[in-house]
Amino acid sequence: KKGKKKWPQTHIDNAKEAEAAYQAGIEIISCEPDHHFKEVRKLAPTAFLSVGLRHGYVSSPQEAIKYGFEILEMGADAVYCSHSIYFIEAMAKEGIPITSHVGLVPNLSTWTNFRAVGKTAEEALQVCQKVKDLENAGAACVEVEVVPIEVADHITKNTKMITMGMGC
């Protein structure tokens, strides 16, 4: 049942890290769609792999759809996307499972300056609204990074998406 089981997750940078994570029982792995990815999938055959669509790598929702399908064809279970709602909605409408992101989003860190997000009531409401917008756009998962635990708990209880907490 949602919110009852916690699944260990990590981000890996190479195949050896993927193998070590998988052998340690880590069930959710995120990685980049680089030359190591096919080996990562081979070494972690049943792990849930969320593979990143680099922010700015594509310039239109149509390019994102094409690239998303390429990532899925390589063996990903979901495509990580921190692009705008328009990109996420277009990809989701085509059946691409999307892992979205709220809170501290490193590639958008100029907005947050690498700090916890959601500590004020106004910011917490903005984070929660962003989650609802992502859910309405069709995202399957949301990575909630460096937000207060109370905000993360509220998000988990009030969305149908899979929530992945980092630093919460």
Label the model's feature ranges.
Residues 1-168:
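Alpha/beta enzyme core
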